[in-house]
Amino acid sequence: VSTRPIADAGDLLRRIPRDSPVAWVRNGDGIVGWGVAARLEVRGRERFSRTQRWWNQLCASAVIDDTVSVPGTGAIAFGSFAFDPERDMSVVIVPKVVIGRRGGQSWITTIGLGTADPAELSPVNALPKAPTSVTWSRGSRERA
């Protein structure tokens, strides 16, 4: 895992990949990742503890070289956890590349073997189109 400063991450929203977006962006700061260095799919009541063990093992075996050292740099994962522990799958993705910005400081993190040239990493995409309409409908709930 290698994190290095870069001159400017640009518009992070335009860096979000179209095919497998993982991002956390707020008010221009945040992180955008692409590629998959590691992935975990887990379900069940122990999904959080199993994920924690997996992440701890991953970090323990990683060589981390982070010259930026702000929240969002170094080893990082994006997770989506199911509300129903038995029914739906939870997924955690460790991206191959992350570009981020926090408080005016920008960086690139590469996870895996080798390093990446920031100029070749992610094409700048058009911003996603805003929804043109919203449809409301009644929901349903099953008894737990």
Annotate each PLM feature:
Residues 1-144:
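Signature of the chorismate-utilizing enzyme
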